[in-house]
């Protein structure tokens, strides 16, 4: 209970901090903060889920034992839990977030779809996450873990658009998504990240076999759930890669098709974007928006060893993560595959 209260206090403090700094001291008690004036949209990380997934009603990602969204809304902070692809790349997730906020069909972009060999369009959201998103009704963005990379790229595209996607749509004779047209930086008030791997993670480098197993196992789960009646329970949202049951297709036909598809080879997924080299490439493309307030809260559950002085897992770390932290702390390769010096 104490940990839950501590986390909630931190979350509220981060979301509100930027807007509170804007208010004169004398007016602090009479004016609303940005978190009170504008809705806050929460974006989950790797293998996470949002309110659109049925599992959220049983085990909410934001809160786990109880849903933080209605609690925060009841306190005057309008809050929503977005659902984006648990294994999808930052680009694909950003496109899904835009479609979810606007109640439209996901458009991954003609150029992007052609480059990575998947369909241009994905799922259709029948209604927006909430009504009225605009420059007059901005949003506060909160991203946990890989959700941090997602919302940073989302804001960058929202603000600057994509000249490549505009050109590709024009060449194809199709309409470009408003998302890729840019000019909407003023639709976001603040951006907050929680334990986000902004520069990638060495875990993928030091635990290659474990990472490969996790990638293959989660991909197999995505394929099986994607064609089953349980898709809505936990939706991987990989329609662009064909992970769904087509009209008139039997379960066995769909199973044979998806099992022979290779999602990981497309390099358009979370496992690639979490590498240090790819994360740095994303960072090079992402610009800071001058009128948006940014906050980042890091986490560290390692401590210096009393015997060696080197970092090791903290005594109060969740047992499941102890071996992972141990391997990560032992990583010593000073150079990434693309030659970046750590």
Each PLM stretch: what is its role?
Residues 12-16, 20:
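Hydrophobic core
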Residues 13, 30-31, 340:
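Intrinsically disordered, low-complexity regions enriched in polar/acidic and amide residues
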Residues 156, 164-342:
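Helical cap/lid subdomain of alpha/beta-hydrolase-fold lipid enzymes
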Residues 31-196, 200-215:
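N-terminal non-catalytic accessory region
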Residues 20-33:
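Sec-dependent signal peptide cleavage junction
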Residues 2-11:
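Bacterial N-terminal signal peptides that target proteins for export
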